[in-house]
A protein has these predicted regions:
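Short catalytic helix/loop segments, enriched in acidic residues and glycine
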Residues: 25-40
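Conserved N-terminal catalytic core of the sugar/cofactor nucleotidyltransferase
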Residues: 2-10, 18, 36-126, 137
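Short, conserved catalytic or adaptor-binding loops enriched in Gly and charged residues
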Residues: 88-99, 179-184, 238-240
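Conserved core of the sugar-phosphate nucleotidyltransferase
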Residues: 135-217, 222, 226
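Active-site metal-binding loops of divalent metal-dependent hydrolases
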Residues: 15, 134
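Conserved alpha/beta core of the MobA/IspD/sugar-nucleotide pyrophosphorylase nucleotidyltransferase superfamily
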Residues: 3-5, 126, 177, 183-186, ...
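Active-site acidic Asp-centered loop
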Residues: 130-132
């Protein structure tokens, strides 16, 4: 009997250099899309997918992430005194959303190393990974829940993927796989950021994973790759030789909020989905066309 996916890891130890100077003194994960930090969108997706415990892997200068998801007694008292019940509920809901733990990645040694820091937290269970640079909007089933359902069927690691333009394959980990049923690929190999002419496909890994605990032993044995970092893709490639792996082409609009243009697109489109902002915002956008 396969184990339920209960735990999720969110790596958030990066320096966010692409967003300097905004990220000089605050984590990029706390930059807001409209009025909510990017990392909160990701945690809400995990909770909506049935995740019960989350480990956020942080680096230095990331304490405000912990503060955001902790109780804020002074703020709650002030809102209560002011009779701002709706805001009070919103603030309390953030800290009550899910059981969140934190651990620090002491050195920036890559995504694979960050995942290995979660070994004690995960134990001997399959787990989810949600990367902080990827927000996925879906009106129906959340992206992570789609992967969990695929895991429940195949009982092994599942990569969240979508097709990208051929010219963009050098930005992603690319899947070499066989399409076996609607939205599902059997993974035969992985290539990290290949040259366009060397890419086995245009099926790209996009920030969501379900991984079996066997990955931790492999990560311990994985040698540093590009830039002296331990790459998760290298470890996943070795995992394929030990067990089956699948990729699921998830439904939803994915935003790369680690990229300035992607961040702007997410901000505009999330604002347009807000009933309290949409009409006036559209009016404003229309003035820009003149």
């Amino acid at each position: 009997m396969s184990k339920k996916i209960r735990k999720a890891i969110i790596p958030a130890a990066g320096l966010g250099t692409r967003f300097l100077p905004a990220t000089k003194a605050q984590p990029k994960e706390m930059l807001p899309i409209v009025d909510k930090p990017t990392i909160q969108y990701i945690i809400e997706e995990a909770v909506a997918s049935g995740i019960e415990e989350i480990l956020i892997i942080t680096g230095r200068s990331k304490k405000c992430i912990e503060d955001h998801f902790d109780k804020s007694v002074e703020l709650e008292l002030e809102l209560e005194k002011s009779g701002k019940e709706e805001m009070l509920k919103m603030v309390r809901d953030i800290s009550d959303m899910v059981d969140i733990h934190f651990i620090r990645q002491k050195e920036p040694k890559g995504l694979g190393h960050a995942i290995s820091c979660a070994k004690t937290f995960v134990g001997n269970e399959p787990f989810a990974v949600l990367l902080g640079d990827d927000i996925v909007y879906n009106e129906g089933k959340p992206c992570l829940k789609q992967l969990i359902d695929c895991y429940d069927e195949y009982k092994t690691s599942v990569l969240g993927v979508q097709t990208v333009e051929a010219k963009d394959v050098n930005k992603y980990g690319i899947v070499n796989g066989i399409h076996i049923e609607d939205r599902v690929y059997k993974v035969k190999g992985l290539v990290e950021k290949p040259a366009v002419e060397e890419a086995p496909s245009n099926v790209a890994i996009l920030g969501r994973y379900i991984i079996t605990p066997q990955i931790f032993k492999i990560l311990e044995e994985t040698k540093p790759g590009k830039g002296g970092e331990i790459q998760l893709t290298d470890a996943l490639l070795n995992l394929i030789s030990e067990e089956a792996m699948y990729a699921y082409d998830f439904e939803g609009t994915r935003y790369d909020v680690g990229d300035k243009l992607g961040f702007l697109k997410a901000t505009v489109e999330y604002a347009l989905r807000r009933e309290d902002l949409r009409d006036e915002f559209i009016e404003y956008l229309n003035t820009l066309k003149k």
